[in-house]
């Protein structure tokens, strides 16, 4: 089981490095964030299954709900930026005003 945790930690680290290195495009940043959330979900689910915590079994589902909300907001922001400016660069996000 330690190999599974090591793989999930590696997946989280690779996603975090991708977020830090390829942060010029919004779509790349969103994909890296989704990879981080997926690795966190799998790690939390495996930890709860291994420790037999019945009361904490809803925590991974709550994490998935927040990940879905984050993805929906990120994609709506991506559509708004690409319709307004024609590109999905992250530096265009500070130009959005209400």
Curated annotation (Swiss-Prot):
Q: Which InterPro entries match?
A: NADH_UbQ_OxRdtase_chain4L/K, NUOK/Mnh_C1-like
Membrane topology, as annotated:
Multi-pass membrane protein
Gene3D superfamilies referenced in this protein's UniProt entry, alphabetically: 1.10.287.3510
Q: Name one GO molecular function term.
A: NADH dehydrogenase (ubiquinone) activity
**GO biological process terms on file:** ATP synthesis coupled electron transport
Look up the EC number in the record and give it: 7.1.1.2
Q: Which GO terms describe its cellular component?
A: mitochondrial inner membrane; respiratory chain complex I
Q: Indicate where this protein resides in the cell.
A: Mitochondrion inner membrane
Chief location bin = mitochondrion
Q: Which reaction does it catalyse?
A: a ubiquinone + NADH + 5 H(+)(in) = a ubiquinol + NAD(+) + 4 H(+)(out)
Keyword terms: Electron transport, Membrane, Mitochondrion, Mitochondrion inner membrane, NAD, Respiratory chain, Translocase, Transmembrane, Transmembrane helix, Transport, Ubiquinone
Which regions span the lipid bilayer? 1-21, 29-49, 61-81
- Family from the record: Belongs to the complex I subunit 4L family.
Q: What does this protein do?
A: Core subunit of the mitochondrial membrane respiratory chain NADH dehydrogenase (Complex I) which catalyzes electron transfer from NADH through the respiratory chain, using ubiquinone as an electron acceptor. Part of the enzyme membrane arm which is embedded in the lipid bilayer and involved in proton translocation.
What does the subunit section of this Swiss-Prot or TrEMBL entry state? Answer: Core subunit of respiratory chain NADH dehydrogenase (Complex I) which is composed of 45 different subunits.
Name of protein? NADH-ubiquinone oxidoreductase chain 4L
Taxonomy of the source species: Eukaryota, Metazoa, Chordata, Craniata, Vertebrata
